[in-house]
């Protein structure tokens, strides 16, 4: 019976999330990774600076037009855009309105991309994303 309830909760939650309206983004709004630069070789931990044009930054839970908060995708493709951004080691949330983060990464190549989301962690419509960058973390 517990398994049935767990499955029901997952199915219902996914269906409800898919029904949430996405916040509109102004035309031309875009996220950028200011630093590190694409192709950079860096040491870990890595300081990642977030940029945003055409919108403002607001903490998660604060519903204000034309604002959102950053999510840093690490070695991950864009998640489904009609659902809240997952919270795991590949989808880092910055729900306090941070515009910079210090991220510990293993040595090797890594792909980073920013995705802005609204107060409910839903990506905007159209999505506000950065171009992905690739960095190499050197072995120390």
What are these regions (language model features)?
Residues 51-62, 122:
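Short amphipathic, basic-aromatic surface patches that mediate peripheral association
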Residues 40-55:
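Contiguous beta-strand segments within globular domains
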Residues 69-73:
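Beta-strand signatures of extracellular beta-sandwich domains
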Residues 46-50, 99, 108-116:
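Short, well-structured beta-strand segments within conserved domains
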Residues 79-81, 117-128:
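Short acidic/polar inter-strand loop motif in beta-rich domains
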Residues 126-140:
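Short beta-strand elements
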